[in-house]
């Protein structure tokens, strides 16, 4: 744990521009590596192989997560890989873990038992399990997760609330998660679902790294969404135009007939206007998407991309108009994208007529709470039975985020 902690400290120093702290952390980390090896040798010598394996497994998870956040050209990566403990111990353990618990390719079947294990237990048992696995990471690694929860309070207002909400979701909705597992349309999606749920309960980061999408941009999987013509898109949570530019990069500016972009934050909306100004047929709306017409209070998040709307108005909160897409867009839609910080369910209800009548392609963020992952597919299934569901993962290793549900309309006979 000291070994991994020193490297974590080094990379934190690097991010903050502390060059001296970066170098010192690397040096201390490498000095700790032989001590780690000596401890393992001692345990093996005393026939405590299970204990040695457990210690190594926890350490390996931490180091793999650290490496996943670094550039392959980072000198710290080269220094780490030159260390004796990395060269002699980690490769064998990596190989063992891959063969034991990780599918080798996206086509390899993932056992439903892995999902069932993460869903097993009462709410109290699951909560106790979550606290236990969080503590195994050590104080600093656990603190980094808690800090993330508190910075982005999407899953709860405190660490206790997050764990309680997670335990309730897994214990009360196991059948819904299993339904989704069976309804997903490819093996990669089932691997993503399993990795996410196990990441929630057991804080496993290696499976998340194994399913991270590296070929395609978020929302635009070219295997599932090949280039279309005369597309009419609604981008809910358009931010500064990053999704629009990604769409143009992947499909070209001649592929869309109209692009509707909705954004609630003034600063982001201004940048969105600048981003899209050179392009024709882009319609901007500084409105929130919801179930129906109304107004809501804008609340600032940790960054401009995480601002949210709520009904509880305050004197300092800006008021934003909300609309239903069914009312706000009068022409047929072929593609709807949503990344609106937990308001996806309301927005989906607000575009139900578009979905029923036109059966557009859907790209929906499903990581802003513990419910959307199964709830949004259930809602779509109720509107139009037979939609094909896929999950893609663009997030990090330490906590599951950037999970996208891609939904294709039912195949026509």
Regions found by a protein language model. Name each.
Residues 9, 16-413:
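Phosphate/nucleotide-binding beta-alpha loop and adjacent structural elements of enzyme active sites
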């Amino acid at each position: 744990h000291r070994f991994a902690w020193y490297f974590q400290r080094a990379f934190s120093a690097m991010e903050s521009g502390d060059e001296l702290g970066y170098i010192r952390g690397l040096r201390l980390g490498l000095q700790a590596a032989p001590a780690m090896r000596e401890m393992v040798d001692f345990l093996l010598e005393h026939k405590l192989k299970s204990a040695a394996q457990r210690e190594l497994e926890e350490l390996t998870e931490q180091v793999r997560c650290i490496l996943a956040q670094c550039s392959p050209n980072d000198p710290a990566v080269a220094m780490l890989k030159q260390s004796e403990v990395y060269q002699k111990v980690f490769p064998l353990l990596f190989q063992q873990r891959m063969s034991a618990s990780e599918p080798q390719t996206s086509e390899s079947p993932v056992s439903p038992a892995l999902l069932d294990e993460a869903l097993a237990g009462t709410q109290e048992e699951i909560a106790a399990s979550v606290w236990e696995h969080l503590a195994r990471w050590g104080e600093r690694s656990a603190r980094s997760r808690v800090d993330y929860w508190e910075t982005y309070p999407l899953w709860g207002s405190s660490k206790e609330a997050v764990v309680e909400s997670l335990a309730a979701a897994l214990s009360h909705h196991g059948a819904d998660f299993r339904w989704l597992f069976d309804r997903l349309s490819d093996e990669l999606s089932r691997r993503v679902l399993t990795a996410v749920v196990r990441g929630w309960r057991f804080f496993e980061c290696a499976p998340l790294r194994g399913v991270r999408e590296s070929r395609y941009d978020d929302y635009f999987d070219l295997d599932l969404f090949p280039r279309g013509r005369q597309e009419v898109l609604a981008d809910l949570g358009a931010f500064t135009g990053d999704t629009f530019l990604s769409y143009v990069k992947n499909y070209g500016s001649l592929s869309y007939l109209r692009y509707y972009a909705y954004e609630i934050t003034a600063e982001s909306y201004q940048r969105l206007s600048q981003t899209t100004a050179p392009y024709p047929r882009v319609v901007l709306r500084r409105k929130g998407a919801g179930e129906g017409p109304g107004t809501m209070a804008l609340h600032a998040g940790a960054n401009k991309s995480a601002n949210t709307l709520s009904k509880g108005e305050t004197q300092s909160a800006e008021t934003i108009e909300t609309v239903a897409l069914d009312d706000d867009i009068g022409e047929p839609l072929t593609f709807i994208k949503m990344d609106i910080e937990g308001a996806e369910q309301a927005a989906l209800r607000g575009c139900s007529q578009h979905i029923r009548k036109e059966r557009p392609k859907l790209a929906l963020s499903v990581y802003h709470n513990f419910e959307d992952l199964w709830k949004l597919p259930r809602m779509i299934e109720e509107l139009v039975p037979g939609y094909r569901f896929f999950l893609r993962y663009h997030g990090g290793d330490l906590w599951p985020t950037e999970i996208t549900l891609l939904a294709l309309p039912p195949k026509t006979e």
